[in-house]
């Protein structure tokens, strides 16, 4: 007789946004590792950029797009009814998928830390996960560790977030090395939370450091700002800096703007770069990690993915955080800590112009980064932790409620 195999449990992974490729790349790496133990379905809040692919064994479901940034909760008041209808539609998709999958684990990115606006769609899902109809699912919150400036939050916001975590979540996973950043530095409710919090390390690419992009010439300065939605000031300053530096030395520079740089800014940048043989401007590259590996120096806003790559490769890096309110705090904190650990230099956004950037790049060319020893196995560690926690929850439930015919999905 053939040996009977146990059906693998389902896992629902709710990704906060499909718009930002850096967030998606982290989601992909964690989902890839979770798929070793679970049948993983990722629920996406927005469409996936064309150049990003999920593993074949990870299913994806697209929610109706709200057309707003959940980080800022900014929306046109005239769209209030439309947004209410969209939230109901998204909630219905989440519930439908939950009923279909009967997941053993529900993992949710960033709620309730950054996504109070999405409470109406997320809470009904969590309540179903906890009501025991299909067994008490493990509910996991996930965040990258450096939150918005907690000083700008009032006590009620922080306390409400902590209450939601204690009421609905079994555990919180922080995708950071605790030596680098701990969540309690940025999130300080009045009462101590009861939900367990685990810092699992930074999430890096499964294959480690990517091979160098062969299209990038030696001794190149690579300028990037994630998807580019707030990269315009950095890119314009980079063009001016290249012109200033070009008067005394030959310095190849490649600017990768990202898909979300507004079209008018893109066209203006291309026009300004025209006629400079050592300056190239591109919307995207096949693999930003490969481009960073090939570059001699990196100038970036210190997004999560760029910071992790700096830790991996020790590429001399200049960090110029975004002036955008939503991104600035996390990028500045991340950059300051990398500078402290000897990874690079920092130019604050209020000091950014062509001359200051040229001076910092010139200093960067003489900079020698130090080796760092942070945990970069965040995807593996998180997947192992979730797998063990789900198993423990199963065993605890079996002991508390023994039954000859366990109806829970396996």
Predicted segments with their positions:
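A donor-sugar binding/catalytic signature common to diverse glycosyltransferases
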Residues: 46, 287-333
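A short, glycine/small-residue-rich beta-strand->loop->alpha-helix junction that serves as a flexible
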Residues: 14-28, 231-233
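Conserved nucleotide-sugar phosphate-binding/catalytic loop shared by glycosyltransferases and other
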Residues: 7-15, 33-85, 89-91, 96, ...
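A nucleotide-sugar donor-handling region in carbohydrate enzymes
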Residues: 143-232, 258-263
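C-terminal amphipathic helix plus adjacent low-complexity
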Residues: 359-410
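Nucleotide-sugar donor-binding patch of glycosyltransferase catalytic domains
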Residues: 312-363
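Donor-nucleotide binding loops and adjacent catalytic segments primarily
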Residues: 31, 187-188, 202-297, 332, ...
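Conserved nucleotide-sugar donor-interacting segment of glycosyltransferase catalytic cores
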Residues: 95-166
